Amino acid sequence: MKKTILISVMLLFVAALGFNLANASTDQPHVYINPGHGGHSSDDRNVPIYPYAQGDTMGFWESNSNMYKCFALREILWKKGYKVTVSRETNTEDDDLALSTIVRLCNNSGADVFYSIHSNATGQGEGARVNFPMGFFRGYTDQPENPQCKVLTEKLAPFIIGNECTVWSSPNYQVWGDWNFQPSWGTQGYGVLRGNKTNAMLDEGSFHDYYPETYRLINKDYCWVEGFNFSRGADSFFGISGKLTTGVVMGNVRDDRRPREGILVMYGADKRQPVNGALVKLIDGEGTVVQTYTTDNNFNGIFVFKYVNPGTYNVEISNPEYETKTVQIEVKADDATYMNVDMKRVRNTPPAVVSYSPVWKEGDAPVKCNEPLVFQFNWDMDVDATEAALTITPKEEGTVKWEDTNYRMIFTPTDAYDVNTEYTVTLKKSTKHGGGVEMPEDFTFKFKTADR
């Protein structure tokens, strides 16, 4: 009896470990990768962003970024000794297979794990944009059809949400059964999960219609790091470690002050401008530059160093418009080191008003009583210091708005100015630009209002 109980307990223990333990000892786990959508066609996802026109295949298409992630994951899994199959090798309509065909091919491949790689979209107006990752498996969230599919999803989650070079609107990776997430579909669920006999999940790695993320997703190396993180999720699921002896570094270079404009919804550091054309050097302890990277011109600020030997490094970031910055980092094997770098702009002259309105002199026609005051500066300005330095005599209350990345200040009176009155407007020399330098002297002008 005791022997029977002991065997039963051992069987329960092995069952609890499930597929994870069973495959931890296999020589070559097999991963099947499906980069979602394809072909730049009607079932693909195109988000037009400057400077790319609607339909431009060089701009953002979900199929492009899904394939970048897929090929990165395959490359890294191969290095780790996995067997890998992918559902398509090119991005054409011809190999944009039906979902049922993908499932059949996966089932026939003998794969242990199936990853369907995607990014998400709100499908709503820009004011509703969000950014967080989600993972789906077949069944109900608390009752998966195959429990190991939920385990697979949960094993991936910390590596995707751990990306510190995006900005998440929510701090959690959402794990869902597809029947719960799409209740109106009943038990149909997602097509690539329906009938899939492997340990299968579908990942929505971020929201591609959150515009700062859209710009990041057209950077192949940014997508490469997501592929790397998928490989870590696979290792965690199979109980594998130590197969990759190098690490990865990814960073995001932004201006430390200048606001990003033209996008309605932004979170956290995404509200500041990314720096295009920053030269980034990875320098080892001997002072040798081991890798370099130049941030692209697609307004994402991303740089990536791949297959970096473990150790301590200095990362030097330079751009002619910014002060050079050096940051020390530590790289670990089969791990990602993230860094967000804020660059201080070189402002080598004092602030000055280069134009203003209304421009008025004695004998000119009077100014309308609701005319805003507009100041155009030679530098991006310290908003608080500049607003505090503004005086209007006689005193007028109003609101201040900034445009042109803080190069332009607009004062609009709350009520109309007094009629037939001469006003004196002064910006005191305590006015500062973003580098903290004050104006050499006060700036003053006058205007006179109309009779009515």
Can you name each region flagged by the protein language model?
Residues 25-105, 109:
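Active-site histidine-acidic residue metal-binding/catalytic motifs
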Residues 29-34, 41-43, 116-126, 136-137, ...:
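Active-site-adjacent mobile loop/cap segments within catalytic or ligand-binding domains
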Residues 247-255, 266, 341:
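A short, amphipathic beta-strand motif
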Residues 265-266, 278-283, 315, 388-390:
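Hydrophobic beta-strand segments
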Residues 269, 273-277, 281-302, 307, ...:
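Short, acidic Ser/Thr/Gly-rich low-complexity loop/linker segments typical of extracellular
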Residues 301, 310-321:
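A short, solvent-exposed beta-strand micro-motif common in secreted/extracellular proteins
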Residues 325-349:
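Extracellular beta-sheet/turn segments enriched in Thr/Pro/Gly and aliphatic residues
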Residues 347-452:
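Acidic, low-complexity Ser/Thr/Gly/Pro-rich repeat segments typical of extracellular/periplasmic
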